[in-house]
Every structure is written in C-alpha cells, then in structure tokens.
C-alpha cells in the first residue's frame, strides 16, 4: 500500500503533472522517429546488388586479370629454371634474340618458300595455318606480312586463310596505279609543306599559317587501289578495308613514289596518312601505335628490297627515315622476265576456279546473284564451323626443353631450302628410274659374246640337240663354271681324257687344224635333206655357220663332259642307217680339246622332266620344209643328273654313271635362266642342234676313279641290240 500511495502521491503532488503527457508524447515521437530511421536503414542491402551487377563474380569475368597476374610469376619461374641450368653466356644463347623474332627475318623466310616469278598455270595457293605451323610463329605475324603483300598485289585473297601467290609479276602495274593515285591526292605537295613547316618551327616557335594547314586538314580519303582482274568483292573485307593495314601500306608506298627526294621519315608519313585534324584528337599513345604499324610495313618492304633504312640529319638532330631503292617502273628486264605471264588471265581462269566463283558471287554493280535458302543455311553452318576452328588460340606452345630453339632453327632452314631440295629429289628419282630401266632392258643377244650373255653367278651349259625326225642320239656338252678347275688329285680323269680316240671326231665341231669339217657338214646335209627341221622357222636366232661354232668353242672350258644319248626311233627307220658304218664302234669326241666323252645307258622306267626355257625353232637354209623340235625333257633329265644338277632318287630312275653315287640337288626352273640356240651340226649323217644352258656356279668334280666297263661304253642301239621301251617313250612329243 505504501508503494501505491507513493506512486499516487508522487503523481498527484508533482507541480508539473499537467505537462507530463506531452513529455510522453515527445518520447513516443522520438521512438517512432528512430523506428522510421531504422526502417530507412533497411534499404542499404540493395547497394551490394548494384556492385554485383557492375562486377559479376563469374568464372570467366576476371580471367584476363588472373592471367595478367599469373603470367609474370610463370615467366619468373621459367627464368629461374633456366638460370639454374645455364649461367652467363649460355643463358644468353638459349634465349631468342630480337633479330630472330623480327618481322623482317620472318618475311625473308616467308618469301624464300615461294618463287619470285611463279608459273601462273600452276596452283600457287597458300594456307596461312600451314605456314604459321611450319615457321613456328603466331598467325597474327603472318597476317601482317600477307596484308602488306596484298597491298602490292603479290598475293590475292581466295578464302579465309587462303591466298594465291602471284610474286613480282604485277609489281610494275601496281606501282603505276599507286603513283597515279598519289599524284591525284597531291601527296608530293603535302610532303613539301610539312618539310617547310619543320624548318619554320626550327627558326621560330610560331605556329604555321592557315594556308599551309588547309591541304593537310582537307585531304580526301583514299581507298584500297585494286588492279583489274585481282579485285576481291567480299562485303566483309570492303566494310573494314579502309582501316586495314594494307590500305596504310599502299599510302606509305605512294609517298615514296611521289616525293622528289625519295626519302620519307616516319613522322611525316604518320602526319600525312593520319591527318593533322585527327592528330589533335589522338593521344600520344595512339600516335605511337600508328608509327609502330608503319615500322612493320617498312620492315616488310625492306625485306622485299624496295626501301632501305637511312638516317637524315636535321637541325633538331638525327632522325630515322627510309629511302626508295626499287628500280624504275616498266623496265625492259622486268617485261622480259614477266613475259611468260602473257597468258596470265587465261591461266588464272584455268587454275583458280574458286577465285572466279567468289568474284561472281560478290560481284558489284547492278547485277547481283541470290542464293537459294538451302545454300544460305549450308553456308552459315560452314562459316560457324570455320569460326570455331579458327577461334582457337594460335599462339605457339612453349616447350621446356633446351633443344626447342635448335629445333625451330632447323625447321626454319628446312622451310627456306624446301623448294630446292624437292627439285633435287625429283632429279635423283628420274636418274634412278632411268638406270633401273637400263638394267632391266639389257637382254642377252644370241650371237653376242659370252661376257654379255653369262651373269656372274652362273655359267652356260652347251647342249648338242639332234633333229629328232628319226630319233637320232642326243649329245650333251656340259660346261662347268669358270672358277672350277680339275684337281690334281684326279689323274684317272685326265688320263681318260687323253685316251679319247682321235680317229672318231664329231662332225660339225671344228678343231684347230681340221679342214675337212666343213666338207663333211655339207655332205651330211646333202645325204639327209628330208631330215632338216621345220620348227626352226620361228626361232629368234638364225643358224650360225661353222665360224660361229668356233666362237662358241672358245668360250667353253676343257673340263667339261661329252654325253651322247641315243634315243630309239618311234617309227621303223629306213635301211640306210643300218647299212652305214658301224657307229657303235666309234666314240664321240668333244669339239673342245681336253673334254672327255661319256656314254650313258638308260634303265627302263619313267623319267622326270626338267623345265627348260627354250626358244622357238629357226628356219635352216637348205632344208625342204622340215622342222626340228625342242629338246626332250628326258634328255635334259639324264644329262643334268650326270652333271649332278638334279637328284636321281626317284623310283625306276635312270642310272647315269658310277660317279653318280651321292645325293644331288634338284634343278629348279628358276636356276635354268637361259637356253640358247647355238648351231645345228651333223653327226654320222644326222643333224645336231647346239644349245647353251646356264648352270649354277657350285663346283662339282668327279669323286673317284672307276674302271672302264663294257656297260659304260655301251651305246643304246649299238651292236645290234634293240633299244629299251623306256627310251622310245622319251621322244613321243615336242615341248613348245
């Protein structure tokens, strides 16, 4: 109660009791004001939203800032690594110099890839992507060179990153056109006014009068000067060509062609090309950028040997300038060198249809072409794909290896010498082809010498092949290789060779001092005119005379074997052969001195045929239409078995001689390289045909001495004995 009374008393007893409500009102108003202020403060969070809109925090928004911040650190790390590996002079050698990275040297390498006066009939297209990759430079550096070359019409644009190389064929026409445009725009007068103004500025600091400023302020805009036939009417190029580097390059060349002393400084060129009215608006940094672009143009023109750098001494000091060094226009030398280009428009029409198609599609004037909507969609899709491909970063990847600089130098040298090496390779290929053709075309002639006919790895085996009209005996002369000589440990063979009876010579084989061989040959042909062969008509070589036989005998060797093989006739023979002298008592004598005869007897059984390359028949003079056939396979089989050229291990084979006692290699068809028709010679009234057969160079000598037996000398058909049936089967048919 006391507290309540106190409150009531205090409330009622206060002299200012009537004023307390207003005080409460004022306090409430202050509270409301604070609340309103607090509510007003609630709007402040909207400001960070505005900052976010200004600088959005996206992954790619500050990519440039991150790269610029990280690139110095990356470069410093690379330098530290190089400094650790190299020190002093070695570090300077590894780092590329400014000269290696200069635009002038790059332009020299670019020009070395292409001829100065190309053939317009050849497709001389240039792909900038390939050139940038081969020269290992950025693509923008190639663009700078190509833009300057395009201003001089040394190249023309075919498509995106595709150009056609014209070389110096159009330089004289380009200089004529540029000089005319420069005279129309009064560039010579402007150069003189600027030079006078510089002199006046040196004398006094006063500004030049208005009369001298008018020509510079009101200079007309000069577009890109195009030659007839080399225009490119693409709208995308024409929209920005006034600001391109190639237009500035043309104007820079105009200043040299028009000025009286053909020396122009970069400051004067920049003032004329940019214009003094624009120089006031441009900053110093932009003006310096323009001068740098002029430096790039001057470097390319210097590499083309059109200008050279000089220094001009003035009152202010020494200034760099450039002097025109190109010879006079339209000289006779240039016309003579460019004379192969008289058919340039026709050749261009044939070699570059894409360029003409592009010109027709973007033709200017009243006549225009429209595309079908489907083609427009297709063209847009192709352009989008090309943009995606070309938008990829073209800067080269820097490798951490120390040999990258050496590799780049070698690549640049290879790019410079590529054309010369390609020409030398083409010449060497042609020479190799010619030599290979000559080696293949060396065919062995029938009547040639033995050196040309016989290769180094094998020798010839001469064979005497009789005309098989009446199945006379075959005679085989087997010649060993040149390297083979009869060993001294085989006296029986030598002795048996000496025991050859001289009273039974082989008819048709001429010996030294034998004068009756020719007459016997003639008489044998007269006695048997009907037995001359008919198949000799198709032979590729003619019958050799007795003198030709001498040539053959000179090439043979004294360690051969003479193998007479008699084949029984298929049909019954006339009685003339039986009434003749007994041939069984005679031994065959080799036409070569030192060659011993060898008689064979067939055993009944089949005989394996040997594939032999034989020539066709040849017509023999003196015959009455009769024909000869190629040697029988059986004869070659037994002859080569005796020579140990093929194996005789077949069942019921032929037993040749006692010396054939060991295994022998089989003669393959590839080892018989040549069968040569030498000469037909008669023997006992029966004509023989001599063949030359190539033999392997493996030396084969008789293995031992065997006693002479009766069966060894027995000739089939001799001493009144009938020939075996197996011998009759050998001469059944001819081998074509």
Swiss-Prot record:
Question: From which source organism is this entry?
Answer: Xenopus tropicalis
Q: Where in the cell is it found?
A: Nucleus
Q: Which family does it belong to?
A: Belongs to the E2F/DP family.
Comp. bias (Basic and acidic residues): 509-539, 726-736
- GO molecular function terms attached to this record: DNA-binding transcription factor activity; DNA-binding transcription repressor activity; RNA polymerase II cis-regulatory region sequence-specific DNA binding
Listed Pfam families: E2F_TDP
What is the recorded name of this protein? Answer: Transcription factor E2F8
Name the major location: nucleus
Q: How does it assemble?
A: Homodimer and heterodimer: mainly forms homodimers and, to a lesser extent, heterodimers with e2f7.
Regarding domains, what does the record say?
In contrast to classical members of the E2F transcription factor, atypical members contain 2 DNA-binding domains and regulate transcription in a DP-independent manner. Both DNA-binding domains are required for DNA-binding and are proposed to form an intramolecular structure that is similar to the winged helix structure of the E2F-DP heterodimer.
Gene giving rise to this polypeptide = e2f8
The function of this protein is:
Atypical E2F transcription factor that participates in various processes such as angiogenesis and polyploidization of specialized cells. Mainly acts as a transcription repressor that binds DNA independently of DP proteins and specifically recognizes the E2 recognition site 5'-TTTC[CG]CGC-3'. Directly represses transcription of classical E2F transcription factors such as e2f1. Acts as a regulator of S-phase by recognizing and binding the E2-related site 5'-TTCCCGCC-3' and mediating repression of G1/S-regulated genes.
Q: Which intervals carry biased composition (Polar residues)? A: 15-26
- Residue segments, region Disordered: 1-26, 386-405, 435-456, 483-551, 716-736
Which intervals carry biased composition (Low complexity)? Answer: 393-405
């Amino acid at each position: 109660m006391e507290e309540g009374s106190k409150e009531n008393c205090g409330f009622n007893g206060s002299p200012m009791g009537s004023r307390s409500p207003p005080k409460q009102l004022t306090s409430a108003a202050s509270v409301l004001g604070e609340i309103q202020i607090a509510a007003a403060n609630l709007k402040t969070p909207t400001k960070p939203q505005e900052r976010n809109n200004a600088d959005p925090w996206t992954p790619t928004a500050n990519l440039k800032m991150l790269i610029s911040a990280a690139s110095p650190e990356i470069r410093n790390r690379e330098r530290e690594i190089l400094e650790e590996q190299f020190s002093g002079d070695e570090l300077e050698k590894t780092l590329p110099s400014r000269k290696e990275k200069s635009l002038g040297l790059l332009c020299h390498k670019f020009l070395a890839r292409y001829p100065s006066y190309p053939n317009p009939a050849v497709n001389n297209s240039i792909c900038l992507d390939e050139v940038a990759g081969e020269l290992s430079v950025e693509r923008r550096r190639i663009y700078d060179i190509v833009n300057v070359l395009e201003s001089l019409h040394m190249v023309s644009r075919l498509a995106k990153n595709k150009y056609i190389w014209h070389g110096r064929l159009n330089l004289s026409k380009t200089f004529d056109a540029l000089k005319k445009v420069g005279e129309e725009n009064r560039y010579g007068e402007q150069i003189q006014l600027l030079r006078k103004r510089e002199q006046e500025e040196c004398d006094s600091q006063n500004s030049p009068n208005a009369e001298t400023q008018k020509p510079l302020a009101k200079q007309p805009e000069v577009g890109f000067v195009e030659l007839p036939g080399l225009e490119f009417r693409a709208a995308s190029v024409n929209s920005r060509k006034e600001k391109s580097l190639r237009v500035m390059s043309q104007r820079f060349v105009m200043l040299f062609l028009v000025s009286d002393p053909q020396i122009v400084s970069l400051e004067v060129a920049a003032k004329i090309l940019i214009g003094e009215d624009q120089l006031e608006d441009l900053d110093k940094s932009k003006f310096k950028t323009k001068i740098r672009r002029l430096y790039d143009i001057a470097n390319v023109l210097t590499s083309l040997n059109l200008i050279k750098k000089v220094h001009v001494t003035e009152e202010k000091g020494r200034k760099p300038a450039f002097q025109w060094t190109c010879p006079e226009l339209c000289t006779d030398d240039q016309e003579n060198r460019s004379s192969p280009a008289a058919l340039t428009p026709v050749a261009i029409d044939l070699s570059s249809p894409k360029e003409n198609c592009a010109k027709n599609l973007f033709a200017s004037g009243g006549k225009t072409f429209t595309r079908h909507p489907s083609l427009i969609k297709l063209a847009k899709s192709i352009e989008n794909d090309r943009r995606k491909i070309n938008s990829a970063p073209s800067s080269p990847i820097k490798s951490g290896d120390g040999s990258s600089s050496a590799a780049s130098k070698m690549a640049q040298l290879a790019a410079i010498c590529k054309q010369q090496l390609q020409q030398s390779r083409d010449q060497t290929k042609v020479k190799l082809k010619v030599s290979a053709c000559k080696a293949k075309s060396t065919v062995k002639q029938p009547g040639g010498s033995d050196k040309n006919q016989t290769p180094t790895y094998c020798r010839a085996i001469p064979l005497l092949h009789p005309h098989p009209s009446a199945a006379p005996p075959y005679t085989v002369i087997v010649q060993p290789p040149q390297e083979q000589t009869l060993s001294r440990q085989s006296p029986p063979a030598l002795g048996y060779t000496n025991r050859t009876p001289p009273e039974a010579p082989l008819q048709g084989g001429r010996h030294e001092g034998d004068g009756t061989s020719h007459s016997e040959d003639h008489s044998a042909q007269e006695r048997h005119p009907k037995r001359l062969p008919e198949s000799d008509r198709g032979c590729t070589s003619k019958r050799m005379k007795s003198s030709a036989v001498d040539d053959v005998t000179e090439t043979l060797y004294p360690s051969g074997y003479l193998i007479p093989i008699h084949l029984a006739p298929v049909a019954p023979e006339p009685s003339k052969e039986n009434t003749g002298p007994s041939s069984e008592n005679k031994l065959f004598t080799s036409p070569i001195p030192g060659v011993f005869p060898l008689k064979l007897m067939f055993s009944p059984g089949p005989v394996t045929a040997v594939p032999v390359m034989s020539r066709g028949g040849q017509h023999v003079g003196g015959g009455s239409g009769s024909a000869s056939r190629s040697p029988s396979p059986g004869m070659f089989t037994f002859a080569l078995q005796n020579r140990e050229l093929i194996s005789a291990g077949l069942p019921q084979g032929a037993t040749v001689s006692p010396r054939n006692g060991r295994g022998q290699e089989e003669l393959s068809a590839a080892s018989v390289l040549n069968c040569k028709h030498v000469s037909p010679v008669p023997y006992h009234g029966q004509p023989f045909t001599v063949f030359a057969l190539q033999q392997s160079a493996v030396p084969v000598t008789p293995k031992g001495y065997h006693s002479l037996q009766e069966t060894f000398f027995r000739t089939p058909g001799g001493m009144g004995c009938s020939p075996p049936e197996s011998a009759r089967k050998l001469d059944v048919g001819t081998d074509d």
